[in-house]
């Protein structure tokens, strides 16, 4: 089955609306580059977190077959709720909207996991309170593509990100994001918490599919 070229379809629109983007390998979580007829890993993708995407980049990437689209986090923040319990996931989404604002940008990959998108008042690095992760500078999340586990397209059930401007998203600070993540972590049953020593630590260079 042929995967749509999301970059060709939506890349320029997202950039015009203020989103920093990067190419994602087909049916993958990974940023990629297309060279000599094949996709390869993109080692320096995190540089896109620190600057706007250029028109020339979008033109080049749009010719790469079956390219997905990632959002380079930093000025845009992803709140990743990596929870497969329907009730807990919905509860944490509600908490995020109370703490951080009622964002219209909610992305579903493997339901009931979900990711909420916000605008950073000032760019900041991401951090984890597993299974909650705040994705910031040096990280990315998938906006459009085929989820590698479900084989289905990522869904935006409220409003598609390509229909929004960055300015439409509620602005948040690192302090607000940390307060939310700490409160959300308390709501997660012990059985759903991964055994990890990284609670509250910065998470740099992450690749997230959701």
Describe these PLM feature segments.
Residues 1-209:
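Conserved phosphate/metal-binding and DNA-contacting active-site motifs used
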């Amino acid at each position: 089955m042929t995967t749509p070229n999301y970059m060709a379809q939506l890349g320029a629109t997202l950039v015009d609306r203020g989103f920093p983007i990067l190419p994602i390998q087909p049916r993958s979580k990974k940023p990629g580059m297309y060279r000599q007829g094949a996709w390869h890993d993109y080692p320096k993708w995190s540089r896109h977190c620190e600057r706007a995407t250029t028109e020339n980049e979008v033109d080049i990437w749009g010719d790469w077959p079956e390219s997905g689209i990632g959002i380079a986090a930093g000025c845009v923040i992803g709140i990743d709720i990596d929870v497969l319990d329907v009730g807990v996931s919905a509860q944490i989404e509600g908490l995020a909207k109370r703490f951080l604002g009622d964002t219209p940008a909610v992305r579903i990959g493997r339901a009931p996991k979900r990711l909420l998108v916000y605008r950073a008042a000032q760019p900041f690095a991401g951090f984890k309170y597993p299974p909650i992760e705040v994705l910031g500078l040096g990280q990315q999340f998938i906006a459009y593509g085929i989820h590698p586990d479900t084989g289905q397209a990522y869904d935006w059930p409220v409003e598609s990100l390509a229909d929004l401007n960055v300015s439409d998203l509620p602005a948040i600070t690192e302090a607000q994001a940390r307060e939310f993540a700490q409160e959300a972590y308390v709501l997660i049953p012990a059985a759903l918490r991964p055994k990890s020593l990284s609670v509250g630590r910065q998470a740099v260079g992450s690749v997230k599919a959701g």
